[in-house]
Amino acid sequence: MKEVTRERMDAFCEYLINEEKSEATVSKYLHDVAVFAEWLGTRDLEKIVVVEYKACLCEKYASASVNAALSSLNCFFAFCGWYDQRV
């Protein structure tokens, strides 16, 4: 089952640090994933749900901000091996 857990986020943080991402980048990526996880709640993590999240972001933020958040999520999904969730 695809879930955004504390353990996965901790492992993702370690991965980003090992990839020599800046502290600001690590912080931003983790923030974006945490916001998504909160929005996701108990829903199943499926591509259609990620597309819905993108639509919600597009209603509130400029396209550059939306793209930055989606980049964070896509990196997290790739890290988890969830390539079919990326948008």
Please report, for each region that a protein language model flagged, where it lies by residue:
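Onset of an N-terminal alpha helix
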Residues: K2-D10
